[in-house]
Design a protein with these regions (language model features):
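Outer-membrane beta-barrel porins/channels
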Residues: 1-250
Length: 250
């Protein structure tokens, strides 16, 4: 749906080979659309035995306001075959929330130098990813247009297993595996949310220069997954992720 001059101009864009709304920015850590809100998390740990600890946590669904850009923080454009249409305005992402999540975990000190951990998480995607809703309000020609991308994600179970070996007082080596069922039905998958990978394999090491200074490095690999959407679009996705972290304790 929509209103005003912008909504009236949409039929003229029907012959465009492409049209898009861009509200990205050059910041690696924050986007152009921002919101405030709150969330909460509860957890407990029980030392069941000297070598065994059990844990549980619950993360509440977020309560975020609508994410908005500035008044001219988004652009709507179309290909030259539609008359090179360009407009600026505000993009609003409506009621986008992070889901509730429950987790159970166990840690076992198998030997003085080997720690084994495992946990299982249940993520309630179905409650927050039914539809991705947006509204564009033109600051140029006036009017607005509302958009919705059906998602219909399913709830997801994620299992993690990892091991850490203290090679000596300074060096710790780590490895792990993560498996999750795919939360996105093939019919609704799209490049905006290519969250189709199901498995991750990780390696890591930590080196303590002193009790107060430590360097940690990790690598995660997600094998390639290929999915064809209901519209016939094929999406392939794999991941390589490297992290480097230096810690200083005061």
């Amino acid at each position: 749906g929509g209103s005003g001059n912008l909504y009236g101009a949409l039929p003229a864009l029907g012959g465009a080979s492409w049209a898009r709304i861009d509200f990205s920015n050059s910041n690696d850590f924050t986007g152009a659309a921002k919101a405030t809100g709150w969330a909460g998390k509860l957890g407990l740990v029980w030392r069941a035995a000297p070598e065994v600890s059990l844990g549980a946590s619950y993360q509440f669904k977020t309560s975020l306001g609508d994410m908005k850009t500035s008044r001219t923080g988004a652009t709507l454009s179309a290909s030259p075959d539609a008359g090179s249409f360009t407009d600026s305005g505000r993009m609003t992402v409506l009621d986008f929330q992070w889901p509730a999540m429950a987790a159970l975990g166990v840690a076992w000190q198998a030997t003085p130098t080997v720690l084994v951990g495992a946990d299982v998480k249940r993520i309630e995607w179905a409650d927050v990813m039914k539809s991705f809703k947006m509204r564009y309000d033109s600051a140029g020609i006036g009017g607005s247009v509302s958009l919705a991308l059906p998602q219909h994600w399913k709830n997801q179970t994620v299992t993690n297993v990892g091991v850490a070996w203290s090679a000596n007082a300074q060096l710790t080596l780590r490895a792990g595996v993560n498996h999750a069922d795919n939360a996105i039905p093939d019919l609704y998958v799209n490049p905006i949310f290519p969250a189709t990978v199901e498995d991750h394999y990780t390696l890591g090491l930590g080196y303590a220069f002193t009790p107060a200074h430590e360097l940690n490095v990790s690598y995660a690999y997600a094998p390639r997954v290929k999915v064809t959407s209901g519209g016939g679009v094929t999406i392939t996705h794999k991941q390589h992720n490297v992290q480097l972290m230096y810690s200083a304790r005061f």
